[in-house]
Design a protein with these regions (language model features):
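Short cysteine-rich clusters marking metal-coordination/redox-active sites
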Residues: 13-16, 98-101, 127-130
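Acidic, proline/glycine-rich low-complexity IDRs
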Residues: 122-138
């Protein structure tokens, strides 16, 4: 299967009865535009990166991008909404995923508290089942 140059997939919330989206996960090949035509310049900072991954829609007012060193594997996991596979590649890529529950949840079902600390902002809290969670990019 050929991996697309740019991919945008909604990961559903897996809380019982919830119809919301946990997050939007996007993958683009090095130097390409996202589906919304925005340019990510991480490939200029990380010349070895094959592409970029962007997460949005999980935390309010927050999205983040990071380098992808294996576009084929990352794209394959995103195409089938496999948050566990993405977590295995890099745990920070799927802040909406609880590895203990093996489920993704939207922001409404997480009990997260923001901490704003002079450039070291983060969220901490628990998933719906009470498993501890820490998000260091916000």
């Amino acid at each position: 299967m050929e991996d697309p140059v740019r991919l945008r997939v909604a990961f559903p919330c897996q809380h019982e009865g919830c119809q919301r989206i946990a997050a939007i996960v996007e993958v683009i090949r090095r130097g390409q535009l996202y589906v919304d035509e925005e340019q990510d310049v991480l490939y200029r900072i990380f010349p070895e990166a094959q592409g970029t991954l962007r997460i949005s829609g999980f935390l309010p007012y927050t999205s983040f991008s990071t380098q992808v060193n294996n576009v084929a594997a990352t794209t394959g996991a995103v195409q089938v909404t496999d948050a566990a596979a993405l977590h295995a590649m890099d745990r920070t890529w799927v802040p909406f995923y609880c590895r203990h529950c093996d489920r993704s949840f939207c922001g409404e079902h997480w009990n997260l508290e923001p901490t704003f600390d002079w450039g070291f902002d983060f969220y901490s809290g628990t998933c719906p089942a009470g498993h501890a969670h820490f998000i260091d990019h916000c």
